[in-house]
């Protein structure tokens, strides 16, 4: 316990590993503790996209979308070997968002974030474009195509951790934080190796809680602070089915309930479909897609793909896999990325900074 780290980070997801890399790159001493493996939780259960959040434009979250799109360009330039462009087809569905609204939203999406290399939006005639072939005949005539990026989410986490370690950070997997106490401006942190059971102590000037859906557990059990009433867990489930189309573009489908559902080419022979959005209570480690969520996603794609004469309730998709990331929403808003930025200008006070999990 001779060394007192500048920053101790709890959580080995994309937030924790990203902070570790950033801090270590600035010359700060860093220790990161993850009770399981890197990206064992939400960060490997995502929709596997690097995107700006097109749907957030409807909520006038212009600053958020602009920042996300700008960071998309940065990430793509840093890791082009695991982040790749992906074209999305957005069919216009009568009775839902009007075509002018989709055009306006995609125009903003193209220009608000300083897009430099990705291809821009174009209008599609779905009666002649190959993207219209898998869709229900006669149901969709007009569509739009725009660009975002896809990513191997777990590998992105590991690469951040690897780079942080190369810059001097100590990355401790299978290491659980049991207790953290602050005295005289320094955090004393009790650690336990979950495999051997051995315990050790570390000290740090600042503590970052980046435990994702376990953030309140760390806050209350380890730090001894009261739980926050404005924190809620949100589950977004995905399913994997045999591929619904043969081309390499993805679909973003509108639902009558106002939500959107992605259908994305996945591992050559499959289609990834997601996501749902519901409140979650219980142990995040035991989260799984409910029958209702599976039915919701199957109905959503069945209303767009296949024979229009089929009843969505009786159309069966061969379910190959599913996963359900649990994210944390603060007061009903999406994950507050700005909390990460407090580390950019200088070390924060010797307090605890809590970060929600990545958005779904």
Question: Language-model features: where?
Answer:
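Core beta-strand elements of the Rossmann-like FAD/NAD(P) dinucleotide-binding domain
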Residues: 3-5, 197-206
């Amino acid at each position: 316990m001779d060394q007192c780290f500048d920053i101790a980070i709890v959580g080995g997801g994309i937030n924790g590993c990203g902070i570790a890399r950033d801090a270590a790159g600035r010359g700060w001493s860093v220790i990161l503790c993850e009770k399981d493996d890197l990206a064992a939780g939400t960060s490997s259960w995502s929709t596997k996209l690097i995107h700006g959040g097109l749907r957030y434009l409807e909520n006038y979250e212009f600053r958020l979308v602009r920042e996300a799109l700008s960071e998309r360009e940065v990430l793509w330039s840093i890791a082009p070997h695991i982040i790749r462009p992906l074209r999305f087809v957005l069919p216009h569905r009568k009775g839902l968002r009007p075509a002018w609204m989709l055009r306006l939203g995609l125009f903003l999406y193209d220009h608000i974030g300083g897009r430099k290399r990705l291809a821009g939006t174009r209008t599609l005639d779905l009666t002649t474009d190959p993207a219209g072939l898998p869709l229900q005949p006669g149901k969709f005539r007009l569509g739009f195509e725009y660009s975002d990026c896809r990513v191997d989410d777990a590998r992105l986490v590991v690469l951040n951790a690897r780079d942080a370690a190369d810059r001097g950070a100590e990355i401790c997997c299978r290491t659980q934080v049991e207790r953290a106490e602050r005295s005289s401006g320094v955090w004393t942190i009790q650690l336990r190796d979950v495999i051997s059971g051995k315990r050790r102590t570390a000290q740090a000037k600042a503590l970052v809680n980046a435990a994702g859906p376990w953030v309140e557990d760390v806050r209350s059990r380890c730090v001894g602070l009261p739980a926050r009433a404005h924190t809620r867990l949100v589950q977004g489930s995905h399913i994997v089915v045999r591929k619904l189309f043969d081309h390499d573009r993805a679909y973003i489908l509108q639902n009558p309930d106002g939500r959107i559902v992605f259908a994305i080419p996945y591992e050559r022979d499959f289609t990834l479909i997601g996501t749902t959005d519901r409140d979650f209570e219980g142990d995040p480690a035991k989260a799984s897609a409910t029958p209702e969520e599976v039915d919701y996603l199957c109905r959503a794609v069945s209303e767009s793909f296949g024979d229009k004469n089929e009843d969505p309730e009786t159309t069966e998709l061969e379910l190959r896999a599913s996963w359900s990331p649990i994210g944390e929403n603060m007061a009903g808003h999406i994950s507050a990325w700005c909390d990460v930025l407090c580390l950019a200008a200088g070390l924060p006070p010797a307090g605890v900074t809590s970060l929600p999990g990545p958005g779904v």
